[in-house]
């Protein structure tokens, strides 16, 4: 994004939405299915509110309407802290102990590769700008089907928070066993057991 090089990158809701909609328009996609995890699980809620007629379905992984503060994100971009290692450590702690170590390490490695301050900037959306609050009540599942799947091992977007979100929308949530915050990458084989039935409903 413009000005990211000077260290003030902050992912906003409007920018995030614009990137997704520009991608869809650029490829001339007609009512695609969008799936997002973590911050992606949050943005699908905004898409459901603002563009329900544009999607065939929306799938949220580890979705929650807001995030209760649990650590100081300033640690993610400081001169006296190795940003890659601390970002990787945070990601690792969000994964289930039952997920394969090789897949967990690969997921952690992705987070260790981010540019300075990028993860911190992404979390600006996740922790602050993207919080939905009472706007959740505007989501109409009859206009666009929404599916919420959350791993049982996640202190960021907990199953309880996703359940509360699902109850507000008036849908069922799917609780996934043996996975954490990154189901598709930390334990893909286990995740597909839950995803395939959802995709079969959509198609």
Model-derived features: where do they sit?
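Active-site loop/oxyanion-hole signature of alpha/beta-hydrolase fold enzymes
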Residues: 1-35, 193
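Conserved catalytic-core motifs of eukaryotic protein kinase domains, centered on the activation segment
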Residues: 2-8, 69-72, 159-160
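Glycine-rich phosphate-binding loop signature in dinucleotide/nucleotide-binding domains
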Residues: 24-30, 141-142, 198, 202
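Gly/Ala-rich beta-loop-alpha elbow adjacent to hydrolase catalytic centers
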Residues: 36, 40, 44
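Flexible "cap/lid" loop of the alpha/beta hydrolase fold
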Residues: 45-50, 55-86
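Conserved alpha/beta-hydrolase catalytic His-Asp/Glu region
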Residues: 69-71, 84-142
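Conserved loop-alpha-helix segment in the C-terminal half of the alpha/beta-hydrolase fold
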Residues: 141, 145-179, 185
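Post-His helix in hydrolase/transferase enzymes
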Residues: 185-199
């Amino acid at each position: 994004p413009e000005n990211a090089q000077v260290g003030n990158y902050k992912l906003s809701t409007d920018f995030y939405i614009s990137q997704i909609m520009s991608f869809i328009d650029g490829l001339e996609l007609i009512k695609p299915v969008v799936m997002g995890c973590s911050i992606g699980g949050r943005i699908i809620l905004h898409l459901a509110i603002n563009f329900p007629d544009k999607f065939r379905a929306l799938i949220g992984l580890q979705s929650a309407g807001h995030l209760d503060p649990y650590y100081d994100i300033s640690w993610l971009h400081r001169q006296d802290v190795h940003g890659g290692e601390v970002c990787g450590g945070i990601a690792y702690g969000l994964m289930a102990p039952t997920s394969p170590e090789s897949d967990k390490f690969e997921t952690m490695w992705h987070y260790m590769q981010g540019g300075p301050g990028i993860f911190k900037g992404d979390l600006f959306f996740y922790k602050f700008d993207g919080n939905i609050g009472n706007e959740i009540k505007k989501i109409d599942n009859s206009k666009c089907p929404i599916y919420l799947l959350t791993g049982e091992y996640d202190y960021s977007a907990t199953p309880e928070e996703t359940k509360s979100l699902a109850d507000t929308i008036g849908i069922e949530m799917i609780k996934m066993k043996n996975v954490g915050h990154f189901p598709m990458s930390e334990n893909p084989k286990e995740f597909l057991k839950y995803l395939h039935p959802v995709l079969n409903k959509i198609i």
